């Protein structure tokens, strides 16, 4: 019986194995058939695309034969024929084409499948001549697709109605209809040019201390040098002036000062421009007096970014050592004046935090980082590594910083709060007994210095030493024998210490993790010199009649800044991150929207909480008071606009109504001058109009609103502004837009780190603009000050606030004798002057308060001599959005405010392992 059962099992097993093999064979056959079908489908698609391209070429030929100034009806008919044939230069036709392709593929697949089912035994695709021809056509599919795309681009991006009543632009295939105002007699006669106004960077608020180290220094000019975004700032705290080096194309990450204290090297990270082209990391060496670029080093050499760098000291700064952020953390040594790389070697796969040349031994370079300290012997083009041996001493998780004692010993601070002294000793060679080997560094002494990490070391001119602690936030002064003499603790609200530098006299400078720069002494404590936000920044509002601006960010801080003396008036921490803000027309209160649907009203003078409300549970994207201040509109990500009655000069609020009709979240909105209507944009490119007195009703006939002269213009979609959109935009490239109060220009914040200045109105596609670089992440907001004298822009991830001065270019003939130039005898001379507003900003009639005399903006100061002439090419802007080139070094003098290529929208701001650390992390971290 058992034998019978065993034989039965064997037979069942054999049968199941045979069944599995049959199924595998069937599946293999099916896969082969499907691959054959795909090949045929590719060939069919190639044929369709080729026919489409031929059709496009024919349409283009017909268009060339038609006069450009023909009747509007003929132009519209031609445009519609292009759309019918799939060749319009808009995205909608291409979307239709893609649907057609899917239908073609589907029918072809069914046909092929039926054929393959009937004639399975006769399938020999790969051997037939027809198959080879089809494969060749399929291989050329990508080329044909490219050709079709190019042919499509030849056609105009907009469609004008036959009657000239409206224009349609397309965004991601969706039509956006904009009605032409009545005062436009002929749309073809509209001309959009570059505005005469330009921008000049005047002030930068903020400092990058959260994820950087050793990036604050005092120069002989009395200026503090530091960086934020792609700007290196030189700040004279006594005279309250700033100068800016603008040569970088993305986030500046590290800085080194030459032994002569004049020349400076700064390194940046990699990025990508708006066209997807890489922005290579590099080091720029520049003159801190003239702000001219002396050399650009490392293009094509560094990966990801420049992590740290240092000038040599023993040879008076002839050489520069750089460590990049690649996996191997490559160490390179450069003769920077010759722009030549002398030596290169891999250091370690672990984090490297610091590199330094030995001040007296020109052949020694020291690097340190996670669980290591390396001593490099440099000879010619070779680098030899000797690892620091901790021996009986506990090996730290991180060696954080380096300094050098007068006797040549190396001093290192570690994550355990210990200072290690490494002395050069002689040891006995293991190869031959009795032989002595010089140059081995060993720990000769250790000193417990701080609770938590020793984050930074600063060797002072008098031989004393300053150390900065991470966790304990203490600055300690040590004498020549490394005995502690004095100490002081940085208050908790400023964060932990990131950088320590020697100041004037007995002063010292501190950079902190909460983006403060402090100046202090052991006797008098600290004074704040620089401060900024510590997280992503979106909210911005300018005061209606004072030189004040308000910002709010993810760090929950609300800050009121003075744009004249560039100081912080007050700051308040909310319960939630702020995202948008607007001042009441009286200027007495400001409304702030948050990420949770709650919004706060604060007293603009005392920062006291006046009111708090909640609308929905999603992010509020825009707050906008009506012109008379009687209504407040709140745009939300729940697709609604909430309306509130406002009384008592902005101190009392009651729900008025709700605008319902958008199919996506609200992005921007504006009021009409009579407070009757609202224009709004949404995330799916809608332009809707609302009748507020009639119960917040949606106006169905949008042409009724075409002649409204909106009190403000912040909507990014509309007839007066649609020309600002770049070609091929997906609808998210523009974050904010604002029209100046004098209605002359439009400022724009984009996703490619740029601030643009357009002429207003801007009703032609691909309008030209002045383009400015300073931010290193998406620019989130822009706003003009009340007299249009300045523009404020905010950066997202870079957390910076930029204040730009509007400059009006005025041309003069040579006979005016303003400036004599031997190089341009017959050319006009161009001078800069601050832009003066044509009309004062008037308060609404409902406002009873009148600004005091001392609240008015002081007269503009004279233009400095160095600003009196415009260069042959404006180096801090690019007037065409089409050009983008890699930065090039200059052997001679290169102006510092050049625009290199477009900076990246850098999510890579925190792209190194230490960047992701929080300021309250464990002491074992390199940033604790």
Curated annotation (Swiss-Prot):
Organism name: Xenopus tropicalis (Western clawed frog)
Key words of the record: Cell cycle, Cell division, Coiled coil, Cytoplasm, Cytoskeleton, Microtubule, Mitosis, Repeat, WD repeat
PROSITE patterns: WD_REPEATS_1 (PS00678), WD_REPEATS_2 (PS50082), WD_REPEATS_REGION (PS50294)
Underlying gene: eml4
Function noted in UniProt: Essential for the formation and stability of microtubules (MTs). Required for the organization of the mitotic spindle and for the proper attachment of kinetochores to MTs. Promotes the recruitment of NUDC to the mitotic spindle for mitotic progression.
BP-aspect Gene Ontology terms: attachment of spindle microtubules to kinetochore; cell division; mitotic metaphase chromosome alignment
Family statement drawn from the similarity comment of this UniProt entry: Belongs to the WD repeat EMAP family.
The keyword Nucleus is assigned to this record: no
Bias kind Acidic residues: ranges: 867-876
Ranges for region Disordered: 107-131, 821-928
Any one of the GO CC terms: cytoplasm
Record field: compositional bias (Basic and acidic residues): 116-131
Coiled-coil parts of chain: 14-63
Protein name: Echinoderm microtubule-associated protein-like 4
Keyword Cytoplasm applies: yes
């Amino acid at each position: 019986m058992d034998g019978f059962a065993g034989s039965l099992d064997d037979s069942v097993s054999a049968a199941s194995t045979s069944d599995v093999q049959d199924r595998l064979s069937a599946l293999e056959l099916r896969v082969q058939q499907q691959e054959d079908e795909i090949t045929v489908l590719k060939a069919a698609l190639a044929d369709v695309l080729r026919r489409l391209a031929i059709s496009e070429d024919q349409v283009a030929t017909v268009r060339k034969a038609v006069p450009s100034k023909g009747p509007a009806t003929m132009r519209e008919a031609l445009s519609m024929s292009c759309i019918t044939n799939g060749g319009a230069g808009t995205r909608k036709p291409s979307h239709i084409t893609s649907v057609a392709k899917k239908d073609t593929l589907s029918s072809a697949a069914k046909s092929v499948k039926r054929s393959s089912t009937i004639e399975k035994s006769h399938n020999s695709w790969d051997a037939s001549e027809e198959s080879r021809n089809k494969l060749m056509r399929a291989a050329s599919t990508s080329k044909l697709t490219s050709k079709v795309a190019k042919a499509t681009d030849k056609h105009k991006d907009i469609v004008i109605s036959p009657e000239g009543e409206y224009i349609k632009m397309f965004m991601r295939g969706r039509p956006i209809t904009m009605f032409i105002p009545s005062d436009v007699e002929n749309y073809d006669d509209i001309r959009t040019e570059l505005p005469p106004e330009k921008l000049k960077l005047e002030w930068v608020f903020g400092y990058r201390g959260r994820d950087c180290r050793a990036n604050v220094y005092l120069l002989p000019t009395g200026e503090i040098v530091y960086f934020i975004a792609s700007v290196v700032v030189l700040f004279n705290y006594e005279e309250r002036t700033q100068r800016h080096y603008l040569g970088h194309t993305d986030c500046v990450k590290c800085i080194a000062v030459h032994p002569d204290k004049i020349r400076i090297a700064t390194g940046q990270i990699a990025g990508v421009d708006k066209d997807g082209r890489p922005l290579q990391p590099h080091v720029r060496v520049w003159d801190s007096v003239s702000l001219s670029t002396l050399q650009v080093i490392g293009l094509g050499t560094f990966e990801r970014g420049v992590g740290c760098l240092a000038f040599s000291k023993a040879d008076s700064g002839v050489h520069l050592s750089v460590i990049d952020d690649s996996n191997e953390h490559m160490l390179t040594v450069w003769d920077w004046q010759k722009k030549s790389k002398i030596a290169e070697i891999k250091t370690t796969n672990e984090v490297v935090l610091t590199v330094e040349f030995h001040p007296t031994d020109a052949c020694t370079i020291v690097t340190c980082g996670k669980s290591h300290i390396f001593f490099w012997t440099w000879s010619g083009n070779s680098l030899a590594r000797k690892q620091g041996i901790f021996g009986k001493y506990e090996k730290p998780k991180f060696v954080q910083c380096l300094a050098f004692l007068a006797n040549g010993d190396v001093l290192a601070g570690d994550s355990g709060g210990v200072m290690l002294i490494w002395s050069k000793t002689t040891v006995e060679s293991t190869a031959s007994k009795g032989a002595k080997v010089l140059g081995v560094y060993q720990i000769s002494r250790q000193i417990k210095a701080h609770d938590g990490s020793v984050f930074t070391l600063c060797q002072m001119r008098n031989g004393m030493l300053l150390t900065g602690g991470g966790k304990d936030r203490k600055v300690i002064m040590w004498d020549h024998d490394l005995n502690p003499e004095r100490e002081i603790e940085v208050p908790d609200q400023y964060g932990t210490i990131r950088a320590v530098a020697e100041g004037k006299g007995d002063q010292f400078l501190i950079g902190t993790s909460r983006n403060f720069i402090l100046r202090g002494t052991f006797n008098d404590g600290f004074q704040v010199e620089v401060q900024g936000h510590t997280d992503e920044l979106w909210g911005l509002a300018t005061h209606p009649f004072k030189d004040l601006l308000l910002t709010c960010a993810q760090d929950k801080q609300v800050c009121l800044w003075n744009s004249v003396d560039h100081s912080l008036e007050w700051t308040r921490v909310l319960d939630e991150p702020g995202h948008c803000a607007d001042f009441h027309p009286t200027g007495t209160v400001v409304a702030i929207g948050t990420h949770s649907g709650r919004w706060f009203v604060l007293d603009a003078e005392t920062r006291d909480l006046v009111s708090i409300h909640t609308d929905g549970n999603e992010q509020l994207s825009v707050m906008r008071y009506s012109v008379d201040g009687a209504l407040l509109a709140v745009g939300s990500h729940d697709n609604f606009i909430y309306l509130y009655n406002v009384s008592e000069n902005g101190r009392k609020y009651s729900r008025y109504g709700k605008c319902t009709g958008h199919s996506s979240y609200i992005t921007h909105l504006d009021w009409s001058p009579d407070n009757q209507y609202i224009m709004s944009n949404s995330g799916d490119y809608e332009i809707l109009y609302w009748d507020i007195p009639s119960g917040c009703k949606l106006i169905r006939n949008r042409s009724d609103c075409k002649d409204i002269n909106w009190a403000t213009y912040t909507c990014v979609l509309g007839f007066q502004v649609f020309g600002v959109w770049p070609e091929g935009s997906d609808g998210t490239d523009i974050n904010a837009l604002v029209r100046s109060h004098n209605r002359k220009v439009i400022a724009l914040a984009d996703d490619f780190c740029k601030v643009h200045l357009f002429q207003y109105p801007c009703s032609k596609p691909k309008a030209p603009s002045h383009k400015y670089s300073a931010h290193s992440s998406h620019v989130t907001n822009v706003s003009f000050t009340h007299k249009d004298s300045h523009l404020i822009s905010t950066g997202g991830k870079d957390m910076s606030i930029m204040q730009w001065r509007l400059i009006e270019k005025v041309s003069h003939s040579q006979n005016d004798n303003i400036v004599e130039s031997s190089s341009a005898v017959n050319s006009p001379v161009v001078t800069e002057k601050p832009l003066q507003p044509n009309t004062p900003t008037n308060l609404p009639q409902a406002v009873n308060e009148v600004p005091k005399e001392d609240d008015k903006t002081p007269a503009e100061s004279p233009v400095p001599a160095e600003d009196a002439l415009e260069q042959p090419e404006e180096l801090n802007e690019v007037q065409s959005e089409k050009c983008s080139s890699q930065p090039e070094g200059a052997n001679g003098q290169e102006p510092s405010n050049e625009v290199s290529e477009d900076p990246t929208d850098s999510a890579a701001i925190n792209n190194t392992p230490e960047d992701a650390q929080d300021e309250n992390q464990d002491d074992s971290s390199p940033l604790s």
